[in-house]
Amino acid sequence: MSIPPGAPQPSYILRGHATPIHVAKFIRGNTRLITGDAEGWVVLWSLETRRGVAVWRAHGGVLLGVGEWGERGEGIVTHGKDNKLIIWKLPPSEEDSMSKILPVDTVSEERRKPWILHILDVNTMNFCAFAMCPIVTEVNPAEHEERGKDDEAQLGMEWEGESEEQLLIAVPNILTSESIDIFHIPTLHRIHNIPSPGPDKPGMIMSLSLFFHPITKCLTVISGYEDGSVSVFALSSPSTRTPSSPEQWNTIYQSKSHIQPILSLSVDPGRDRKFFITSGADDRIIKYLIPATTTPFSPSKSTSKSTTISSTKYEPKILKSAHAGQQGIEIRNDGKIAVTAGWDGRARVYEVTKMRELAVLKWHKEGCFAVAVADVLDRDRDEDKDGRSSVDGKGRELVGGIGYLDVKGKRLRKARETHWVAVGGKDGKHPISINITQLNRPPISESIHRTLGNIESQVPQLGEFQPAIVDAPADARECGEIPLDFVLREAGFQTVGSVGAGD
């Protein structure tokens, strides 16, 4: 396939799924990429070697969502169309015992699955993926037993004692797809139900987000609906609750700015949680402000006929991209760019502040359904006091000496520090591929272009790059020598707009 000069080109093509890829996410400090397909298969890829390190069939239907749980990244959450949400335990130390046979390769024996920690029966009628929010509470085991199941379901925010990892899961209600259920892990109890936001039925819930607001300190839920509207709910503040007025969910914001169903939403990953962005079946990418309040909103009309919002102060910013059907929107953790997967087979990169398109990633011939954006990591934060790097469940690397990295260490550091974007979909051919593009490679100078003809003699020294390991001949992979065409593919990448390493 010809690619326009200067356009972002794939750095790696990972092939292994036999059906369209519906979910993708970078985990463990960018050292792993997890993908899931239409038949329920999950593949955990190593970004260091670009190979699958764990393969299993998590669900009997299409994957709707994946997530990472736990301080050490040992928990993997999968949500399938088979009405199951499963939390698996797969620490890095157990990856060697997992199957490496990819879904496209059929085998007679069943592949080993990770240990199952929890299974939750959920509603998947509307294809809405779960939302999750980790919490850390202090639990006294003796008091835990005395309080019983009812109080246990209230999370015990005032308990004191031993620390315990817990999780909140938000999914559409089992009976009515316009309301939201929130479950507590590990008790599996439903602790909250949020009803439909108003008398006008907005249709099915299409996308969810769940978090604790940093200013109000209250649990907050954002939902996108089939009619193109969004609602923001906040649990009433503990300081305002009385015996006669128990906790309740207030709708603090509403807006209807999409003219087609909302397909995805992503919340500001920064500490302040100031905004969120949505994409839909229409051509609009919309940015909304999140009110820092728990007070119910007062409806008012905006200047736009298609928009009803809580106040003109929070009127959304609308970008008409002229490209309908963008889903899987994800904001990078530095809050500077957002990426979408398009039905037209294109992934698009947007600048969040100015809400403008920066780049179009073109590779797939048919629709793209999933996108993942690697975190921008702070190297200084991940190094210990003596200047050495370490490795843990999040993927930090172990270096043999101060200031020294061997070949493996360089590959691991590159995997962690590169600004990757992974795009998955259906190519119209087998096997299905995941397109991983690098956003921070510097432009190639003219002098380098003039000397590329002499680079072949230096190829054996460039084995650490392995720019196309999946496509490289087996003998080249084994000896570390990469043929010239693969080196050219790696060297030919251009920077994308203003999203370089200094952004």
From Swiss-Prot:
Keywords: Chromatin regulator, Nucleus, Repeat, WD repeat. It is found in: Nucleus. InterPro entries: WD40/YVTN_repeat-like_dom_sf, WD40_repeat_dom_sf, WD40_rpt. GO terms for biological process: chromatin organization. The keyword Nucleus applies. SMART domains: WD40 (SM00320). This is ASTRA-associated protein 1. It comes from Sclerotinia sclerotiorum (strain ATCC 18683 / 1980 / Ss-1). The lineage of its organism: Eukaryota, Fungi, Dikarya, Ascomycota, Pezizomycotina.
